[in-house]
Each structure stands twice: as structure tokens, then as C-alpha cells.
């Protein structure tokens, strides 16, 4: 028991360090490309000329594609293990291919830092899980390998989103049946250790998103939250179907990986000429939506362009995560509804923010089929725990409808 406790804490601390180092590497590339270190790719896009804005994501995609293509071409052996930590935990034995995972993470760093509309958390969690896998193979029994990889993945998620409980449930819900409930203890300990470490490294204990404090929802607001869950239940499968169609369209072009990723990048770059907000994973835009939301038409325009950018990035094969882009789409959809509802003052002054947070949780639930994780993650990311009952209700509704329409979640379809 003591041994597991010590290993869990160690994996949590190292995972947080890995996530922090990846973020520092992103800031370093941002300084090289844009002479900025504020971490906002949207601000970087707005500060450069139009031709640079159009070409930078394409060049980043080209560089990442060349890296992946060269590795595949000159690697004379088949991968000894997967590079997907989900696969390693669910159907594998806990091993990850070290060299392939490192190359994939480096390629992700290139596309994320150059503006592609893809999440950075994919590489962060992969690297955390990779360290846990290497450690387990050397110091643990084979029957424990999956457990420690799960600890690394949960700790990476907790570090990236400041959400240790949601990071733990991310493993428990999405990989249901592959881990015994008794094994959840080390996963939670690793995730909490990761949060404490990342707070120490970043010099603060702020939530990921800063929002105004909301009171407990009124009965009519609970109804609207449930209604938004219903809408997300239909929107989630459509979003996943669009991602699958985009991927199929890019593959049908039969391009080499460098050209395929460059094409995805140029689409993002051209869209950014209309709205610079399409650059990056969407974190800064979500923060802006939650604090100073623009008008309905502007939100709608940004949403359409960002959605096309996400489809271009993911469809072209850009390595990265879809968590944060999904949160953005959900926040924008929710804020659109909230802005419309705000025309009726009886629904409350904070209805826009409430709907945006509900949209984030429900679309995440509809795409991951993990309602408890999605609801708890939004609460942890914002500190708005008074919303948890309403978010749980709306997320369960969204997940139920999404499962009925499309039994395969975003993680089963990738």
C-alpha cells in the first residue's frame, strides 16, 4: 500500500513537470515565430501581417508532416507498441512505443505552436503516460503496467486542465471495465499530486478559466440547462460525423503526409484572415466568451470559422487533442443560446454565462460519452461547483441522446 502511494505521488509530480515543460516549449516556439511569450496564439495572429497569418499554420503542418513522414519512411521496424495511451490501457498491456510517441509529440508541438486549431492536451497526456509506461516496465510487475499508465494519463489531464477529479474520472468512465474500482485510489492520488505540482510550478492556484461567481440556478434555469443538454445530444454526433467526413476527404486526396498537413494548415491560415480567433486550441477565445461575450452575429461567425478550422486540422491528421476545441464549440453554442435567452430579463442577468458553461459540459459529454467527467471538469476548471447538479442532469441527457444516435465516442472513432 505504501509502495503504491509513493509511486502514485511520484508519477503525479513528474507528469506535472512534463506538462509544464511542454508548455514552456510552446512558449519558446512562440517567441521564435512571433517574438511573443504571452501564450495567446490569437493575439499573435492578430499582430502579424496577413500573409504570415495565412502561411504560418501551413508551414507548421508541413514541418510536422515531414517529421512524421521521415520517421515512417526510415523506421525499418514495425511499432513495438501503440502510441495511443487509450489503446495501451484498454486492449494493450500498458506498453507504449517510445520513439514513435516522442516523434508524435514533437509533431504535435510544431502544429499546435504554429496555429493549427487542435488541442495541445493530447501530446501532454501522451508524454505523461509514456513516462509512466517506461517507469512501470522497469520497476513494476507486468500486471500493474496498465494501472501506472492510467495514473500517468490522469495526472497529465489533471495538470493540463487543473481538474484532478475529472482527470481521474476521465480514466474511470471512458475506460470503464478495464480498471477495478480499487485501482482508482492511485489514479486519484496521482492526479491530485499533479495538480499541486503544476500549481507550484506556475506560481498560483487559479482555476483554468476565471469567471464571475454564479448563484445556484433557478428552476427555470435548470430547465434551460436540460434543454441545452438535449441540443448537445444531437450536436455531438454531428460534430463527430463531420470530423470523420473531413478525415475521409483528406485521405481521398492521396497526398503525402507533409502536403496533407500543410493543406490543413493553409485552410486554417486563410480562415484566420477573417477571424484570427481560429488559431490555436481555443482557450483564450473561451475565456473571452465567458467574461466579455460579443454579439450574436460575431459569435456565430467565429463559431463557423473555428469549426471549419478544427475540421481542417483534425481531418488533415494534425497530431493533437480535441478536448479544448470541443470545449470552445460547446461554449460558443451555449453562449449563442444564452444571448438569445437574455432578451427575456426574467431568465436572469447571468443566463449567458450559465448557458456557455452548460454548453461546454454537455458537448464534451456528448462526444466523450462521459457525463460525470464532463460535468465535474467544467466545475473544476471554473470553480463553479454550485452548477454541478444542473450540469450532471444536462450531461446525462446529452450523453443518452448521443449514445442513441452514435454509439461510438470520439475516442472510439480515432
UniProtKB/Swiss-Prot annotation:
Cellular component, GO annotation: chloride channel complex; plasma membrane
Location of this chain's protein in the cell: Cell inner membrane
Pfam families: Voltage_CLC
GO BP term, pick one: response to acidic pH
Topological type in the membrane: Multi-pass membrane protein
Record-linked InterPro entries: Cl-channel_core (IPR014743), Cl-channel_volt-gated_ClcB (IPR023790), ClC (IPR001807), ClC-type_chloride_channel (IPR050368)
Record's keyword terms, sorted: Cell inner membrane, Cell membrane, Chloride, Chloride channel, Ion channel, Ion transport, Membrane, Transmembrane, Transmembrane helix, Transport, Voltage-gated channel
Principal location: membrane
UniProt cross-references to CDD domains, sorted A to Z: Voltage_gated_ClC
Keyword Transmembrane belongs to the record: yes
SUPFAM superfamilies, per the entry: Clc chloride channel (SSF81340)
GO molecular function term, any single one: voltage-gated chloride channel activity
The keyword Transcription is assigned to this record: no
Entry's transmembrane regions: 5-25, 54-74, 116-136, 147-167, 169-189, 220-240, 255-275, 292-312, 327-347, 353-373, 381-401
Listed PANTHER family: CHLORIDE CHANNEL PROTEIN CLC-E
Family: Belongs to the chloride channel (TC 2.A.49) family. ClcB subfamily.
Function: Probably acts as an electrical shunt for an outwardly-directed proton pump that is linked to amino acid decarboxylation, as part of the extreme acid resistance (XAR) response.
Name of the featured protein: Voltage-gated ClC-type chloride channel ClcB
Highest classification ranks of the organism: Bacteria, Pseudomonadati, Pseudomonadota, Gammaproteobacteria, Enterobacterales
Amino acid at each position: 500500500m505504501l509502495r503504491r502511494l509513493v509511486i502514485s505521488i511520484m508519477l503525479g509530480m513528474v507528469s506535472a513537470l512534463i506538462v509544464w515543460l511542454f508548455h514552456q516549449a510552446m512558449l519558446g516556439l512562440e517567441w521564435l515565430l512571433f517574438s511573443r511569450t504571452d501564450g495567446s496564439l490569437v493575439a499573435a495572429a492578430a499582430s502579424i501581417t496577413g500573409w504570415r497569418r495565412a502561411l504560418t499554420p501551413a508551414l507548421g503542418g508541413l514541418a510536422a508532416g515531414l517529421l512524421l513522414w521521415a520517421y515512417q519512411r526510415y523506421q525499418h521496424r514495425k511499432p513495438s507498441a501503440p502510441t495511443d495511451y487509450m489503446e495501451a490501457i484498454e486492449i494493450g498491456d500498458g506498453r507504449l512505443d517510445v520513439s514513435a510517441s516522442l516523434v508524435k509529440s514533437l509533431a504535435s508541438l510544431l502544429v499546435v505552436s504554429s496555429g493549427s486549431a487542435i488541442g495541445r492536451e493530447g501530446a501532454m497526456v501522451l508524454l505523461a503516460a509514456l513516462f509512466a509506461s517506461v517507469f512501470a516496465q522497469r520497476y513494476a510487475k507486468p500486471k500493474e503496467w496498465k494501472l501506472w499508465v492510467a495514473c500517468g494519463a490522469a495526472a497529465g489531464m489533471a495538470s493540463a486542465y487543473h481538474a484532478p477529479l475529472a482527470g481521474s474520472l476521465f480514466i474511470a468512465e471512458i475506460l470503464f471495465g478495464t480498471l477495478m474500482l480499487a485501482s482508482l485510489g492511485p489514479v486519484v492520488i496521482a492526479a491530485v499530486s499533479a495538480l499541486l505540482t503544476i500549481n507550484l510550478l506556475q506560481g498560483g492556484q487559479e482555476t483554468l478559466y476565471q469567471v464571475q461567481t454564479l448563484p445556484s440556478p433557478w428552476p427555470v434555469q435548470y430547465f434551460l440547462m436540460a434543454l441545452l443538454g438535449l441540443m448537445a445530444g444531437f450536436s455531438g454526433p454531428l460534430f463527430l460525423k463531420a470530423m470523420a467526413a473531413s478525415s475521409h476527404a483528406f485521405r481521398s486526396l492521396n497526398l503525402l503526409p507533409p502536403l496533407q498537413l500543410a493543406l490543413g494548415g493553409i485552410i486554417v491560415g486563410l480562415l484566420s484572415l477573417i477571424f484570427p480567433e481560429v488559431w490555436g486550441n481555443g482557450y483564450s477565445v473561451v475565456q473571452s466568451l465567458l467574461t466579455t461575450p460579443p454579439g450574436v452575429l460575431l459569435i456565430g461567425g467565429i463559431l463557423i470559422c473555428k469549426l471549419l478550422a478544427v475540421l481542417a486540422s483534425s481531418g488533415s491528421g494534425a497530431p493533437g487533442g480535441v478536448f479544448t476545441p470541443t470545449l470552445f464549440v460547446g461554449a460558443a453554442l451555449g453562449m449563442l443560446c444564452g444571448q438569445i435567452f437574455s432578451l427575456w430579463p426574467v431568465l436572469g442577468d447571468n443566463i449567458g454565462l450559465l448557458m456557455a458553461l452548460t454548453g461546454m459540459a454537455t458537448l464534451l459529454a456528448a462526444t466523450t460519452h462521459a457525463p460525470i467527467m464532463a460535468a465535474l471538469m467544467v466545475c473544476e476548471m471554473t470553480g463553479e461547483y454550485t452548477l454541478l447538479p444542473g450540469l450532471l442532469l444536462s450531461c446525462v441527457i446529452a450523453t443518452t441522446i448521443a449514445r442513441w444516435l452514435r454509439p461510438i465516442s470520439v475516442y472510439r472513432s480515432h
